[in-house]
Amino acid sequence: MENIEQRVKKIVAEQLGVNESEIKNESSFVDDLGADSLDTVELVMALEEEFECEIPDEEAEKITTVQQAIDYVNAHLKK
């Protein structure tokens, strides 16, 4: 089973069409990985689906880097 970090990076790569090797934890979805606002919405939806959690809009707006996505999932994952 892949860990959360690997799963988040895989989703980011698939959603944004970037190579997984280019994705660093500190990568910004918009500044480093070229995401636009629609990409970020779709990315949040993909994370919600993968991890079976709901990310409220006000929380989703705060998730701007790969590490923030990993941290959010770790904190809110259904145990």
Swiss-Prot record:
Coiled coil: none
Entry keyword set: Cytoplasm, Fatty acid biosynthesis, Fatty acid metabolism, Lipid biosynthesis, Lipid metabolism, Phosphopantetheine, Phosphoprotein
Organism: Azoarcus sp. (strain BH72)
Lineage: Bacteria, Pseudomonadati, Pseudomonadota, Betaproteobacteria, Rhodocyclales
Protein name per its UniProtKB record: Acyl carrier protein
Family: Belongs to the acyl carrier protein (ACP) family.
Domain of life: Bacteria
GO BP annotations, alphabetical order: lipid A biosynthetic process
Domain annotation Carrier: ranges: 2-77
Molecular-function annotations in GO: acyl binding; acyl carrier activity
